[in-house]
């Protein structure tokens, strides 16, 4: 049986975590983002989508695929 291809989503940090609540900073770290304009490709799951929604003012979705 062939493996099912997992969907991915690429996010870029566009906002600084300075003077943001610690929960938002922790969410960015959880997404693997720690510097401005860094990009990470993550597995597209409901939990990742929720994390992106929590810091949507600090990140940008670059690619969904």
Swiss-Prot record:
Gene Ontology MF: a single term: structural constituent of ribosome
Cellular component aspect of the GO annotation: cytosolic large ribosomal subunit
InterPro entries attached to this UniProt entry: Ribo_uL30_ferredoxin-like_sf (IPR036919), Ribosomal_uL30_bac-type (IPR005996), Ribosomal_uL30_ferredoxin-like (IPR016082)
GO biological process, one term: translation
Keywords (A to Z) from UniProt: Ribonucleoprotein, Ribosomal protein
Keyword presence, Glycosyltransferase: no
Pfam families: Ribosomal_L30
Keyword Oxidoreductase (UniProt): no
Protein family according to the UniProt entry: Belongs to the universal ribosomal protein uL30 family.
Oligomer status and interactors: Part of the 50S ribosomal subunit.
Protein name in UniProt: Large ribosomal subunit protein uL30
Gene coding for it: rpmD
